[in-house]
UniProtKB/Swiss-Prot annotation:
Belongs to the cyclophilin-type PPIase family. PPIase B subfamily. InterPro entries: Cyclophilin-like_dom_sf (IPR029000), Cyclophilin-type_PPIase (IPR024936), Cyclophilin-type_PPIase_CS (IPR020892), Cyclophilin-type_PPIase_dom (IPR002130). PPIases accelerate the folding of proteins. It catalyzes the cis-trans isomerization of proline imidic peptide bonds in oligopeptides. GO terms for cellular component: cytoplasm; endoplasmic reticulum; endoplasmic reticulum lumen; Golgi apparatus. This is Peptidyl-prolyl cis-trans isomerase B. It comes from Schizosaccharomyces pombe (strain 972 / ATCC 24843) (Fission yeast). Transmembrane segments: none annotated.
Amino acid sequence: MKLFYFSLLFTLFFGLISANRGPKVTDTVYFDLQQGDEFLGRVTIGLFGKTVPKTAENFRALATGEKGFGYEGSIFHRVIPNFMIQGGDITKGDGTGGKSIYGSRFPDENFKLSHQRPGLLSMANAGPDSNGSQFFITTVKTPWLDGHHVVFGEVLSGYDIVKKISKAETDNRDKPLEDVKIIKSGQLSQENVEDDGTDEL
């Protein structure tokens, strides 16, 4: 009987550890951001390529620009305090455009991950199966988005920059009065990634 209880406790303990780890980060990308004339710094983002491989690969390739187009030079066109910051419209810059590496749009991959905390990366869309290049980063828990938007990454460092952007002064369309621009983007090797941002969330 003692052996049974020991085995049960062992299973529960390591189950909790595994659950706390969350989805595996397979790739890390970065955005160097500028607001108006002010350089804000670098945000690094981990992508959950095991859980949502197609969605993660789309974002990774757009961050590197290896397909001939991508996020570099684009802006965060929509900012709502206590909700999220949205960017990735690489064709029009106003929330009506964007395109993926698979064509104009691609389907929702899955909804395995929930919008359970700030600092999560999720696909913006115009309805079911309409993913392109637009994305948003949460600044609060947003459970009402579960089942509608695909979560596929998290901020690893630079969340303080995300919070600063979320407080930017905006017009009546939620667009920052000063452009918040991705002046450089790319991919980091996993060996050189310092996961120091999760403590900020």
